[in-house]
Amino acid sequence: MFWTDEDNERLIRDEYPSFWGTFQKVDKGVVKSDLCRILYLHKYGGIYADMDFICLRDMAPLLSPLGGHIVLGTHNNPRQPLPNAWMYSPKGDQFWLTMAHDSFRDLQNNVERSIEQIAGPDRLNWAVETHRPNHTELAHNLVYPRAWGVEECDKHASRVDWGKIEAVKRAYPNSLAVTTWSHNW
């Protein structure tokens, strides 16, 4: 499913009306998207993946036994070990609503935060550390085999023909998915 800006507004306005007034004041699209991704996980559950993710293999054998858990991929970046570009959750997990409340509270109180600290990967890492949800962290090679800014990973990625799925699968044989890290926000 692809969510548009209009879908995001409808989600907040209709399903989470207590956040609507604050959401309308947010002036950065990436912040709105980050806020909505956590609320889509709360409302619907399932997998959230950024548009620059490529699914390489069936994830059901891994995720099915973990159905009651939030599942997060790990990344070889000590500053943000848990990115928010790929996440799995059961429907209605209260962790996401708690995280959203934290984010919206900071926005309402005009707490000075970076984009990534409002509802992005820094907020996710803080929320996991603070609220300790029932979750599983996957080895980095399963979902985030490509670490941005790591020379070895960048060299490997530069040799991949990203337009051919079989070439990408060969380049990342032990991975379920990979992101191109387009950083287009």
What are these regions (language model features)?
Residues 34-46:
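Small-residue hinge/turn detector
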Residues 1-33, 49-185:
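Glycosyltransferase-associated regions of secretory-pathway enzymes
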